[in-house]
């Protein structure tokens, strides 16, 4: 078995054909001007954890490592929902889900809204009006009936599954078809195999799979992942020398479950070297019961060795995406466009990847699902490359960043995010946010959840179960829920026929004075944010007004 050193050597060799070459040294970053407006290249692989690209992390990402040394890494970037559609819509609009209207999967009958609200504007529209050439390649997943072209992009390559507009089948015909498929295909499939999750009547799933060598492309990557990137490289070649600034976005399935990866990338890792996440043994006893059900109904079927193998495949899939990213960077360099191109590497959301014993994404509030990788390189616009910035960044910040870089006045658009350009210039922006917020209304099954997180604490309002409160300094892996109620105490009071009232403040569950103050402060922030961003999560009726403090606490 190879050693860790040979793994790194193998990864470096794998990336050699798409090496990120050093760029010439730059002086003081230039301000965006119409005469030298930057190009914009965005690579968004799906479902990638933030931690996998951190320097020193055992997941192999040699291209991102070199790229980060030439740019700025934002370690505290968060999406507004750990779900493809709302986060991708926020990226394209600079708005939160409550403002653009996309809360869950737009391609299901349970979509809260199948498309962004009418009149929603997308940042490519502004770039096009400013003279930019625009192109989109790969996964979209922003609306059921809108395509990248509708949002201002010119489509280069879109997977077959998304090459449709106004072709969605809903209502009775769709339901009849779904039932017929379920009856025919989702049968009990016998004993569980290694790496499988047994789901009676639903059909088993293979969490991970090692695929044969892929000979259809020089990287040995999955063809469905390679094609959007290949289309992007061809577009980069055509854009060179066009005389116009351009923006190109390339997106694919990234590290999305399930973790099926060609053997070439799997063999870069030693299964014996894979460690379980530090919070893997979390029994979730003080967490919402849906979290417990997700773990114990499905994921607890996997042995520790299977979990390690699944993590290995998740990392291997991320390494494959890193090789594809290197192909884009290499093409950008070879065509002479790297010097004045803003390149962004990010994801739409994360993946639990074994954290707390969970996989994929969804309603669990843990940071592994919300914290996304974010690295930006712009040789002409970055001071002191190689930095890490730990300020809170939101997915909504990218759209205004691109527009400011293009020289478009902020008075021309209305967005909720803030430009990241000051951070790139090495400045400390005035009044930068000291908290981040989420807006989750569920996935295919509905759950109302809101998160407010500061550097010190994280509060999770769960309209469907107990709330959560974590001390981010003392408990960085979110193991102990400080808001978990002492149910036995309340039960005893009920059995004794006594009321729970304890004076002026009867917020439940009772907490220590310090934590009670923390909770009140964070809920004040939550309601203030909800009001500012038109988030209609309050209803005063007694059966649904479950937050310990209602919106009146902010007044």
Question: What name fits each language-model region?
Answer:
Residues 258-264, 330-394:
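Histidine-centered active-site microenvironments of extracellular/periplasmic hydrolases
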């Amino acid at each position: 078995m190879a050693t860790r050193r040979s793994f790194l050597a193998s990864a470096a060799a794998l990336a050699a054909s798409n090496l990120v070459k050093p760029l010439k040294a730059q002086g003081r970053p230039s301000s965006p001007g119409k005469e030298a407006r930057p190009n914009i290249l965005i690579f968004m692989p799906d479902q990638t954890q933030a931690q996998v690209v951190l320097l020193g992390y055992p997941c192999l990402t040699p291209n991102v490592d070199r790229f980060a040394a030439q740019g700025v890494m934002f370690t505290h970037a968060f999406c507004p929902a750990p779900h493809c559609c709302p986060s991708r819509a926020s990226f394209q609009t600079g708005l939160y889900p409550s403002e653009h209207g996309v809360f869950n999967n737009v391609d299901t009958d349970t979509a809260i809204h199948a498309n962004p609200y009418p009149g929603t504007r997308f940042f490519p529209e502004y770039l096009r009006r400013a003279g930019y050439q625009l192109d989109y390649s790969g996964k979209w997943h922003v609306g059921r009936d809108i395509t990248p072209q509708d949002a201002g992009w010119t489509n280069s390559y879109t997977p077959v599954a998304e090459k449709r507009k106004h072709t969605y089948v809903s209502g009775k015909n769709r339901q009849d078809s779904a039932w017929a498929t379920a009856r025919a295909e989702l049968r009990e499939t016998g004993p569980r195999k290694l790496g499988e999750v047994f789901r009676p009547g639903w059909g088993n799933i293979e969490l991970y799979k090692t695929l044969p060598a892929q000979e259809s492309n020089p990287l040995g990557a999955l063809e469905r992942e390679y094609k959007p990137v290949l289309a992007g490289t061809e577009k980069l070649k055509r854009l060179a020398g066009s005389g116009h600034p351009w923006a190109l976005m390339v997106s694919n399935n990234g590290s999305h479950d399930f973790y099926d990866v060609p053997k070439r990338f799997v063999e870069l890792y030693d299964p014996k070297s894979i460690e379980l996440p530090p919070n893997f043994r979390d029994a979730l006893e003080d967490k919402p019961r849906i979290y417990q059900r997700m773990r114990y109904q499905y994921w607890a079927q996997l042995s520790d060795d299977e979990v390690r193998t699944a993590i290995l495949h998740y990392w291997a899939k991320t390494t494959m995406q890193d090789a594809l990213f290197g192909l884009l960077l290499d093409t950008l360099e070879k065509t002479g466009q790297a010097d004045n191109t803003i390149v962004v590497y990010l994801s739409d959301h994360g993946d639990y990847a074994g954290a707390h014993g969970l996989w994929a994404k969804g309603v669990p509030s843990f940071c592994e699902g919300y914290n996304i990788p974010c690295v930006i390189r712009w040789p002409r616009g970055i001071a002191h490359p190689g930095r890490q910035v730990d300020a809170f960044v939101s997915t909504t910040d990218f759209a205004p960043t691109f527009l400011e870089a293009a020289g478009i006045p902020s008075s021309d658009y209305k967005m909720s995010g803030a430009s990241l350009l000051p951070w790139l210039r090495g400045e400390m922006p005035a009044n930068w946010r000291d908290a981040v917020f989420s807006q989750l209304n569920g996935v295919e099954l509905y759950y109302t959840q809101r998160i407010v997180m500061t550097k010190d604490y994280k509060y999770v309002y769960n309209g469907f179960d107990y709330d959560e409160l974590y001390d981010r300094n003392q408990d960085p892996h979110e193991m102990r829920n400080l808001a978990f109620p002492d149910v036995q105490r309340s039960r005893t009071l009920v059995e004794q026929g006594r009321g729970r009232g304890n004076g002026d403040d009867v917020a439940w569950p009772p907490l220590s004075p310090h934590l009670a103050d923390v909770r009140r402060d964070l809920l004040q922030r939550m309601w203030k944010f909800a009001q500012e961003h038109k988030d209609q999560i309050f209803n005063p009726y007694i059966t649904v007004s479950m937050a310990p403090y209602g919106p009146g606490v902010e007044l």
